[in-house]
Amino acid sequence: MIEKKESTISTEDAFLVGVVFGNLSSSKVSEHLEELELLAKTAGANVVHRYTQKLNRINPSFFIGPGKAQLIIEQAKSLDVKLIIFDDELSPAQIKNFSNLSNSIKVIDRSSLILEIFSQHAKTKEAKTQVELAQLEYMLPRLTRAWTHLERQMGGIGTRAGAGETQIEVDRRLVRTRISNLKKELDKIDKERETQRKNRKENYKVALAGYT
């Protein structure tokens, strides 16, 4: 049986990154980082440093320039931080490029952080299923070595590599399978809710008939 992965943010020391670009002023980015810090704390992270970078253009490889990317990785290492959170949304390629700079430091963005918070606060079976589905659909195109070895978190049938499969291919297969199963589970929940609604309606009609 495949189980939902545990939180990878809770109790981590975090390094926040904000970018001054376009119409965004330094003060506005500072406000965004204040919000991001609150979100990180809500997820259980301990923010130890905030970094702001002014850009004339977005770098397609790292969002910020490659030199600055290496710099924040080195700063994070010096602070013994394993989690860097960007206020801006990163592309799958940018996530992959950061993972190539360091396997020991995980780089995520605001969207991933918010999904983590939703996951922690989901109470009902349906809410937990919806959040896990959203997390995995977000993760799939961004899957890199930083996300690998999912069999430790999602153990069960189908975790072994087939002929010629790399570990990351196994991980992607695991995620796709889990996404498919979660969608089926949500369909089942919807059908059960509809059946319950119809039953309540019929019971109401029967009860009403008893009074007439």
Task: List the predicted regions and their residue ranges.
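N-terminal accessory targeting/assembly segments
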Residues: 1-114
